[in-house]
Amino acid sequence: MKLKELVSGLDTIEVKGNMECDICGVQIDSRRVDNGCLFIAVRGTAADGHNYIGKAIEKGAVAVLCEDMPESMDERVAYVKVSN
């Protein structure tokens, strides 16, 4: 499925990158990310997924859904900022 289809119902604030990229899975745990995944950076009580965006990309994430855009962005990755 295309990233733009997956996020079409969300209230997106900002988008960077290719929204036409193919997504083969969705993960909130950076340790479980595989090639072609969308990584959702969840802010939890014990950990903040935003701290693991880099690790998720290293493991093959092609897109990131986040509340805050990272300071450093990989131009091969699509980033979608949402309010929550």
Annotated model-derived regions:
Residues 1-84:
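N-terminal leader/targeting and accessory segments in enzymes
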